[in-house]
Amino acid sequence: MLSVAARSGPFAPVLSAKSRGVXXXXXXXXXXXXXXTPEPPVLDPKRPILSRESLSGQAARRPLVASVGLNVPASVRYSHTDIKVPDFSDYRRSEVLDKTKSSRESSDARKVFSYMVTATTAVGVTYAAKSIVTQFISSMSASADVLAMSKIEIKLSDIPEGKNMAFKWRGKPLFVRHRTQKEIEQEAAVELSQLRDPQHDLDRVKKPEWMILIGVCTHLGCVPIANAGDFGGYYCPCHGSHYDASGRIRKGPAPLNLEVPTYEFLSDDMVVVG
């Protein structure tokens, strides 16, 4: 301040030098800042510091070798104590919940219950399988209209004695022959040793006067001609097979007799074939 008054020139006599002490807040701020300084952290010497060096020191430095012996463990097992293993108590029966109690006392009752459940399940599955198989097989069977067409009713009074009438049955010719008494006696007297396909006449008819046959030659499937041939029965014009009045092969290349279908007499005047 004195230096400023000396350099002021003409204003020097007017100016006077004075000094006054002013309290500054810088010291207080410095003291407050010094009091708030935290102390350096103290490390726990017992707790290891995780670093690259400490972790590498715990790793294996040599190849792992498995040793087996009487007093040497064959493997190393690490136990995880933080895993909670369930005891399945919710799924166990009340008889086996007590660990201190033997389960042999209730084993018979538990076995009987298991057997009953198994048997009931097996019966149910079997019944369901039966229903499924029955429905599947019934779906493959012929319908009612097809079964109705598979049978044919024939009025026998429309066929005179000694005549043969042909019908269509299941797409095949059906022969119904009203035989005379002479034809019945003649066919019954034929020796079986003379036949290529031995079969007695009475085994091929239900009533001797009615002969019902499928009119398809057993050689290659041609339709024979009735009341023709060397034996007065049926003759196949394709390859010359001769059948008698009972439909049995007597001559020619046919190996078997004419087929006899399934039929039933509803009355003396009505027969159902099929």
From Swiss-Prot:
Its cofactor is [2Fe-2S] cluster. One of its GO terms (biological process) is respiratory electron transport chain. Residues 187-272 form the Rieske domain. One of its GO terms (molecular function) is ubiquinol-cytochrome-c reductase activity. One of its GO terms (cellular component) is mitochondrial inner membrane. Disulfide bonds join C222-C238. It is a single-pass membrane protein. The Rieske protein is a high potential 2Fe-2S protein. This is Cytochrome b-c1 complex subunit Rieske, mitochondrial.
